[in-house]
């Protein structure tokens, strides 16, 4: 009986493993608000972003953002780096074509959550 209980406990733990959701990757962030902010800041005018109108081709496609190894080809893709990049791309890569848009940290977290979810 103990063996069955132990196996059941392992199965439950294993079921919880794997890739996290966007909200677990960016705790406390709201992907739906991220979509609204992406539209507000006009991100789709330069980037192709799943579920966002525009489909610009100036910046890189952000489809499958969570699968990218690097952000802007420069920094490792992680939620913290994504938030920093969204807030201050010019500080990270001076002269990059992506402008500083005055995105606050909570807004950047929501935008990152949306990108990781799509």
Where would I find each of the regions flagged by the language model?
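Extracytoplasmic electron-transfer domains, predominantly the class I c-type cytochrome c fold
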Residues: 36, 56-118
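Short cysteine clusters
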Residues: 43-46
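Sec-dependent signal peptide recognition
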Residues: 2-7
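Inter-heme linker and motif-flanking segments adjacent to c-type heme-binding CXXCH motifs
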Residues: 20-25, 51-53, 72, 117-118
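Secretory-pathway extracellular proteins and peptide precursors enriched for disulfide-bonded cysteines
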Residues: 8-9, 35
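Electrostatic cytochrome c docking/interface patches
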Residues: 18-39
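C-terminal motif of bacterial Sec signal peptides marking the signal peptidase cleavage site
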Residues: 13-16
